[in-house]
Amino acid sequence: VAKIKGNAQVLVDNTFATPYLQNPLELGADHVLHSTTKYLGGHSDVLGGAVVTNDAHVDERLLYFQGNVGAVSSPFDAYLTARGIKTLSVRMDRHCANAQKVAEFLQGRPEVKQVLYPGLKDHPGHKLAAQQMRGFGGMMSVRFHSAEHAKQICLNTRLICLAESLGGVESLIEHPKNMTHVSAEGSELVPPEDLVRISIGIEDI
């Protein structure tokens, strides 16, 4: 994308990868977006976000909004985020290792139709991810043989919490069609009903 963008500005949401696994500015992006609520905070107790840019003009405008509009984190959220970043590398290594194990396990289950995780060699983005990332992250999607099966998986898990967030130390599962993407109904962004999203935590697997 960076090679063919022309005069367009490229902004990459790097929330799933974090700066530990991928650095979009070094790959040609103009700006990078992070939800610090997720992996950077890492403990499901922060609300925040960050924009990183190499563009001095954009940086100046962002500083203006921060100073005049108040687009800054609360002191306590800033403290929690700084605390979380101290363990980012250790946590991300564990997220990646656990996700790889879970993806490979699920891929061998007859109940599962498809596992979408870039750490699997049959994933269409595996080669690219291996080239530009230092790990494959902790997020995956799993497709089952029916929408009802997917819903029942979400409603009957005993070790994984049913919740919309991601990037915390605990594993979370959700049904995007009826949760995170419910507002996308009627658009091209509607996920398949048989799809489940899992945020793999740092538990002992």
Q: Where are the language model's segments positioned?
A:
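Conserved PLP-enzyme active-site core in the AAT-like
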Residues: V1-E111, L116, D122
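Glycine-rich beta-alpha junction loops
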Residues: F16, K38, T87, V102, ...
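Short, flexible turn/loop "capping" segments at secondary-structure junctions
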Residues: G42-H43, S73-P75, Q132-R134, E188-P192
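Mobile, glycine-enriched helix-loop/loop "lid" segments at the mouths of ligand-binding/catalytic clefts
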Residues: H57-E60, L162-K177
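Short, well-ordered beta-strand elements within core beta-sheets of diverse protein domains
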Residues: T81-V90, G137-H145, V196-G201
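PLP-dependent enzyme catalytic core of the Aspartate aminotransferase-like
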Residues: R91, L155, S171-I205
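Conserved small-domain helix->loop->beta segment predominantly found in fold-type I
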Residues: Q100-R158, L162-E164, H181-S187
